[in-house]
Amino acid sequence: MTLTLQFHPNWPHEGGMVIESMAKTGMYRSQFATGISNGGLTAFVGGDRWHWESRLFAGRYDGVPGAERPVYGAWNRRADPYGGAIRFGSSYVRLRAEVVERSTFCFPDSVHEPTDFGAADLLPHLCALADGSGFDDLDDCVEAQVHGPVRFGTDVEAVVLDPCFQGTEVEASARRLGCAVEFHPGFTASPSAFDPDYRGSHIVELARSLGDELTPGILGDAARAGVHDPQSIKKVWHCLARFGRRTR
């Protein structure tokens, strides 16, 4: 089992793609520093995320720059080849084992203001809670908060991408990160496979408008085009993540 940080490499950031920004900085940065998130969008002073962190960490980060705040990931308790929290991205960073020592964990997600929160010695308890929760598998991750910088050259074991990115600018940028690059089995599905009750029939209709067979590459193209509501594209991703996993 490992600690993973999920992300969408080809979604927009700073006029390019997320993976390009990562390659420029050599770091996986906090949502307070990047201004983007694949979850809630309240990472600003006085926002919900700011208040959650203030409570969880007893004010430790209240006055620090965004770049010094923790980054969020998940304990990949099932050794899932897709990562520990696929709700938040088609690709992921797999961290070196020693990073666990400077991480904290909780269940459920911190958006729910959990009381079960602590260091790595609490992981067996948190994993048992997650296993028994009955939550959808996009929602049952054991959340991790990594304290201190995450540098690709020293703290990361590998970046794991969807195979649709092989031979693309996404892979080229990933190979500039200074860590290994791997590929998981892949996400792909026809919108006809999506249950309209999962995220709504309007989301299935949007998915159909994007193509007959969807991949993370296609969704990233749609996200960068800026034609559709980003929150709706995010929900199409939830459907692809839920119904589009495949085995080798």
Predicted regions, residues:
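Active-site-proximal loop/hinge segments that shape catalytic or ion-binding/gating pockets
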Residues: 1-6, 11, 20, 25-64, ...
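Catalytic metal-binding/acid-base residues of hydrolase active sites
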Residues: 78
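Short hydrophobic beta-strand that contains or immediately precedes a catalytic carboxylate
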Residues: 72-75
